Amino acid sequence: MSRSDKNPHERLKTAKKRTASSARWLSRQLNDPYVKKAKAEGWRSRAAFKLIELDEKFGLLKGAKRVVDLGIAPGGWSQVVRKKAPAAKIVGIDLLPTEPIEGVTIFEMDFMADEAPEALQSALDGPPDLVLSDMAANTVGHKQTDHLRTMGLVETAVDFAVQTLAPGGAFVAKVFAGGTDTELLAILKKNFTTVKHAKPPASRKDSSEWYVIAQGFKGRPD
């Protein structure tokens, strides 16, 4: 059935659902203290506070010299890196356009593309000591499906980190609860000395997201 063949009443119900959903989102944004704080402090997104909180707990940015930001748009995480590690070389990538950030090299391309890893490494001019991934697949509202789609991105990010990180380096990634994390954690524990997970206060309570923090990269076999 084409869109034009739909019952007008059905179209109206769908429109009402979209309107209600948009209204809830807008209300949440307007009443979110992190959104207000981000705007007041000049951060591009409330997500900046997630990295700030993770860094305060795990010391991720101390001594960072080369940092990769996977899923950089709109740029909040790279802003934090730039402020806390001003001497670090920062490279980010995202399918979505990202406004320039001083001192940050940004690639507007798909991280899953074959040429992406080489482009990132070439821009860094050396192995990264921190790989950040705030990537998430477009959600469909079904927790298990959203989890699996995002896990595909996370697994690719882990592979990139293991192939490129300097010994002693760290990896941070967003995941969604869903019960298929066992293999991911096993790979991380094999390659890093410590692997922990955290849900920073800036993560919304009703969100199933959490972050995996892997530190002390053991290095690649010779």
Curated annotation (Swiss-Prot):
Stretches with biased composition (Basic and acidic residues): 1-13
Subcellular location: Cytoplasm
Gene3D superfamilies assigned: Vaccinia Virus protein VP39
Keywords, in A-Z order: Cytoplasm, Methyltransferase, rRNA processing, S-adenosyl-L-methionine, Transferase
Chain segments carrying region Disordered: 1-22
EC identifiers of the protein: 2.1.1.166
EC class: transferase
Binding site for S-adenosyl-L-methionine: G75, W77, D94, D110, D134
Any one annotated GO CC term: cytoplasm
Active site feature: K174 (proton acceptor)
Predominant subcellular localization, coarse grouping: cytoplasm
Reaction equations catalysed: uridine(2552) in 23S rRNA + S-adenosyl-L-methionine = 2'-O-methyluridine(2552) in 23S rRNA + S-adenosyl-L-homocysteine + H(+)
Record-level Gene Ontology MF annotations: rRNA (uridine-2'-O-)-methyltransferase activity
UniProt xrefs under InterPro entries: RNA_methyltr_RlmE, RNA_MeTrfase_FtsJ_dom, rRNA-MeTfrase_E, SAM-dependent_MTases_sf
HAMAP family: RNA_methyltr_E
Its job: Specifically methylates the uridine in position 2552 of 23S rRNA at the 2'-O position of the ribose in the fully assembled 50S ribosomal subunit.
Family: Belongs to the class I-like SAM-binding methyltransferase superfamily. RNA methyltransferase RlmE family.
Protein name: Ribosomal RNA large subunit methyltransferase E
Organism: Novosphingobium aromaticivorans (strain ATCC 700278 / DSM 12444 / CCUG 56034 / CIP 105152 / NBRC 16084 / F199)
